[in-house]
Structures are given as C-alpha cells and as structure tokens.
C-alpha cells in the first residue's frame, strides 16, 4: 500500500476549514523563495494513543489513531548543494540551511529545529543509497505545523516523517510504500538520542479517515485500521499546557524508562532461564532482552494474532513479575549487580553507557508490571471490539480500561502528575467514560472517551478548568487546547496544481 497522492484537501474531514492555512503557507513560501514555484506538498499528521503507552519499545501492540493536526511541507527543488528550510512561524523556527556537500551530522548540544529535519534527511538519504540514488537535489522548503510541540501528540514524529517524505519525493521516489516509509522513519529520532519505539511514526503514516489503528511490531511491523462499533463515540484531546520535551528530560524520564525496562528484561531472562534460549534474541533498543522477548521465551512464542493466547501469556507474566522482581520501590545498582552476577563496571558498561540516565534507584518491578498490564489492556480492548455488545456496555468497558491505564501510568510508570490527574478527574465527572495521559507523559496531552451527546458538558468543564488554572488565557488558546477529533488520514502528498488554485 503506497502513500496516497491528492490534488485537493479531501483528506481532511472539513477541507474548507484548512484552505486559508494552505494559502498562508503558499504566501510564506513565495516570500521566502520569490523565484520558486511549489512543486508539491508533503504532509504527515500527529497521533493520539488511545491505549498502550510505554510498551511499543518492548514490541507489544498499541491502539493509536492519526489526528487532523499535522505538519505540511511546501517544496521546490533545484541543483544547489543545499537545503533551505523555513517556517510559517519564523519567530519560533528561523530559517536554517543544511549543506549537501558535507556529511550530515547532528549536534545534540545545539538544540535546533533543523536537527529534526536532519533526522528525516539522514534516513531518506540512506534509503536513496539503497536504491543507488546518491546525488541529492537541493530543496527550498517551508513548513507549517499545527501539532502542538511538547503536547504529547507526536509533533516530532509528524515533522520527521513529513521531512523524510519530502526528501524522497523530491529525489525521484514517486511511489513509496507505507511499510517502507514507516520502516525508515521509526529510527529517525534515534539520531537525536531518543530511544523510541515505532508507534508514533506508524500511526502517522498508516492513519485512515474514520479509523483507528492496531499496530503490531512482531513478527513484523504493520498497522491494521479498524472502526469503532459506536457511531456517536468521539475523543476529546486536551493539551495540559505542561510542555514535555522528551529530549531535554530524557535522562530522568523517557530514556530512563527504556533503560529500566531493558534491565528488567535481562534480569527476568536470567531468573526465568530464558537467557540464551534458542530463538530468543536480545532485541531491545539497548541490546538486551525485551519484555516481549522474555514472555515469548517463557510462555512460548506468540504470533500477535491469537488474542486469547496473548491474554493467557500476559496474565502469566503479570503473576511471574510479582514473584521474581521482589524489590518493590526500586533496586540499587549494587542490588542489580548482585542478582545479575555482574561487577559495577560491567553493569555500567552494559546498561548505562549507551544511554545517559540519572536515577537513585531502578524501579524494575513497577516498570515491568506496567508493560505487561498495559499490554493486556490493549488485547482486552481488541477482544471488546470483536464482541457484540450494546453501545453503553462498550463505552463503559473501554472507559474502564482507559482509566486502569491511567492509574498504572501514574503509579507504576510515574509518567503522570497531580495536574494531569486533576484534568482526568474533571473529565470523568463531566461526561467522559475514560481519561488517560497519552504519549510519553510528564505533561503533554490527555485523551478522553465520550459521546457527541456528552461533548458540550465535557468541553465546558474543561474550558472552566483552563480559565481557572491559567488566568488571562484567551478563547483561541482554549480552542487550541481542547479539541474533539475523529481519526484522520495519514501521510500523503499533495500536488502542484492545488497551490495554483489557492493563489487564485
């Protein structure tokens, strides 16, 4: 299945609502590059994860959906040895230049928006080299983004995917499969030092209008669209306005979770005699046993399709974690070394050298338990989707699963906080069936399950919260912070004739 191409805005639920934005993008492009004509637009959306957070990098399936906020790149090509990138928000994202005559490098100490573009450029150039296309074209690009940065809706993934798509199409890749675009962009943010899984990129690429996604990582990466059985169901996404920059806080938040889960995987593998078992490899981002790999080694390989088998295996692992990782509240490095038979030097070299992290103790029990319990909730949601139930029962059951997820994100994964919990409580008291932090957490956004009938009461209560919590906030800022969203179209290309129509 290829990334689709459009000659209009029909991929939006309300095309007319986006026309002025594209007109502004064209106007800004012409002001930056007066001698150029836009050849095409490359676009990729943000995403909201409905259930299944901090489990994708352990290769357990997740249930996100693409949303209509997105990143759009207006592109022209030339024969210069440089790429110039600009933005409609030039005050926040000033014009930058990337030389094609030099090796692409990312200075992690110098944090700039061009680094994200370079992530897309690097993976695109590697893909082009695989196709024996080594000479890159110069490009002039202007970006427009509506995904809030640091809002937990994958603005960075949307930007990296749109950048990758722009570079590929500009260099003659007229037809790229969704599978290839996902495969190469999954690792794009690794160049910034973020050890993410593949959920964000896959959701951005595979999104379909009106459908959420079941994303699997084993035995292969794929996204399967599905529809909800309740027609009046809708999701409200609230930006907490607590900016969560995954890269700046990675050593104490996101990357620390990756490391804790990696160590938990190795310790479980050792204690459960999975270590060295035939067919079970060290497949995590940090070359350890993943928690999915441990489950497959201990319970038997799961094909990712038979939900009943997956449920049995996960329930078994939840029981095993409680009996095996016995130090609730955290392990010291010394305790880890003792249980794993390693010296402190060996432990540091194996687990703490590749990814810089900061901690007092390593909460292996809590993190592993979260992964297995959250993964079980994903499968129970899928089972619910395949069961004939009335609308009320579906909403109540799915809402309960979302609320259980929020509890574990707060208590076991510690990626929520009191203010996020307060927003969830307000929503649940005013028409939401389920509310949970979505994405990396530590700020960002919350997703609420509700119905069209309950929508006015829910949004009114959330608007009141913002006015109380943020005196002076404008109505426009509230509208941007509280959005109801249906599932949206994923990555796509929009052709040149449309830009002419906009200028007319």
Swiss-Prot record:
It is an enzyme of class 2 (transferase). The active site is at residue 200. The record marks 47 as: Transition state stabilizer. It catalyses: alpha-D-galactose + ATP = alpha-D-galactose 1-phosphate + ADP + H(+). ATP binds at residues 150, 152, 154-155, 244-246. Alpha-D-galactose binds at residues 47, 53-54, 56, 196, 200, 254. Gene3D superfamilies: 1.20.1440.340, 3.30.230.10, 3.30.70.3170. The keyword ATP-binding applies. Keywords: ATP-binding, Carbohydrate metabolism, Galactose metabolism, Kinase, Nucleotide-binding, Transferase. GO terms for biological process: galactose metabolic process. Disulfide bonds: none annotated. Pathway: Carbohydrate metabolism; galactose metabolism. InterPro entries: Galactokinase, Galactokinase_CS, GalKase_N, GHMP_kinase_C_dom, GHMP_kinase_C_sf, GHMP_kinase_N_dom, GHMP_knse_ATP-bd_CS, Mevalonate/galactokinase. PROSITE patterns: GALACTOKINASE (PS00106), GHMP_KINASES_ATP (PS00627). Its EC number is 2.7.1.6. GO terms for molecular function: ATP binding; galactokinase activity. The keyword Transferase applies. Galactokinase is a key enzyme in the galactose metabolism where it catalyzes the conversion of alpha-D-galactose to galactose 1-phosphate. Can also induce the transcription of the gal genes in response to the organism being challenged with galactose as the sole source of carbon. Belongs to the GHMP kinase family. GalK subfamily. This is Galactokinase. The lineage of its organism: Eukaryota, Fungi, Dikarya, Ascomycota, Saccharomycotina. The gene is GAL1.
């Amino acid at each position: 299945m290829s990334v689709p191409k459009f000659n209009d805005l029909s991929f939006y639920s309300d095309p007319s609502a986006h026309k002025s934005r594209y007109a502004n993008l064209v106007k800004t492009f012409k002001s930056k590059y007066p001698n150029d004509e836009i050849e095409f637009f490359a676009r990729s959306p943000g995403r909201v994860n409905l259930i299944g957070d901090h489990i994708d990098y352990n290769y357990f399936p997740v249930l996100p959906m693409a949303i209509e906020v997105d990143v759009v790149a207006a592109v022209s090509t030339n024969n210069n040895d440089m790429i110039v990138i600009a933005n409609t928000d030039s005050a926040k994202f000033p014009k930058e230049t990337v030389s094609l005559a030099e090796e692409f490098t990312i200075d992690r100490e110098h944090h700039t928006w061009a680094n994200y573009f370079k992530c897309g450029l690097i993976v695109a150039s590697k893909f082009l080299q695989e196709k024996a296309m080594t000479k890159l074209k110069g490009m002039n690009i202007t970006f427009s983004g509506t995904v809030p940065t640091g809002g937990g809706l994958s603005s960075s993934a949307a930007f990296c995917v749109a950048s990758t798509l722009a570079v590929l199409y500009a260099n003659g890749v007229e037809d790229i499969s969704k599978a290839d675009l996902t495969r190469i962009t999954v690792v794009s943010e690794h160049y910034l030092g973020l050890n993410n899984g593949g959920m964000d990129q896959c959701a951005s690429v595979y999104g379909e209008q009106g459908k959420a996604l079941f994303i699997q990582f084993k035995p292969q990466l794929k996204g399967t669209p599905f529809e909800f059985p309740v027609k009046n169901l809708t999701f409200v996404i609230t930006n907490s306005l607590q900016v969560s920059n995954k890269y700046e806080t990675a050593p104490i938040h996101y990357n620390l979770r990756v490391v804790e889960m990696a160590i938990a995987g190795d310790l479980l593998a050792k204690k459960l005699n999975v270590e060295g078992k035939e067919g079970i490899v060290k497949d995590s981002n940090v070359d350890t046993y993943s928690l999915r790999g441990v489950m497959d080694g201990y319970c038997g390989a799961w094909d990712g399709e038979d939900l009943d088998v997956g449920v049995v295996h996960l329930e078994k692992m939840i029981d095993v974690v409680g009996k095996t990782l016995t130090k609730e509240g955290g392990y010291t490095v010394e305790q880890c070394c003792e249980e794993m038979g390693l010296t402190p030097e060996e432990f540091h070299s194996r687990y703490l050298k590749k990814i810089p992290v900061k901690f007092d103790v390593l909460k292996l029990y809590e993190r592993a338990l979260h992964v297995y319990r959250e993964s079980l909730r994903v499968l129970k949601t899928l089972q619910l989707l395949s069961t004939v139930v009335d609308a009320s029962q579906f909403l109540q059951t799915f809402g309960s699963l979302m609320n259980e997820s929020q509890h574990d994100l707060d208590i076991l994964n510690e990626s929520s906080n009191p203010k996020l919990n307060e927003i969830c409580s307000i929503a649940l008291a005013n028409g939401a069936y389920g509310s949970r932090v979505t994405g990396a957490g530590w700020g960002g956004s919350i997703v609420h399950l509700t119905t069209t009938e309950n929508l006015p009461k829910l949004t009114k209560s959330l608007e009141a919260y913002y006015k109380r919590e943020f005196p002076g906030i404008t109505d426009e800022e509230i509208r941007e912070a509280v959005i109801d969203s249906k599932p949206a179209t994923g990555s796509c290309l929009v052709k040149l004739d449309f830009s002419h129509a906009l200028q007319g």
